[in-house]
């Protein structure tokens, strides 16, 4: 299982419309990527490591699926549509990373 994460570094003077991102872009991404995604989540930064410090990331999206190949098979056909939507909510250049997902039981 892998998790594709897309992070938006929080930079001074940057623009990020969390309302549009959460209510338009992410639901569209989940719908377009379809059943290959086992889970789709979004997080909005609220604070940094020190109280009052700006968060390192304006937002983080996570897409869980079986493999990088499965993600790419779902993403490639809709990538233009998703990428053209980015300027509607931000001027931040997103960073994408694929991670192996290791789960630990909570006690």
Residue positions per predicted region:
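Macromolecular interaction modules
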Residues: 1-107
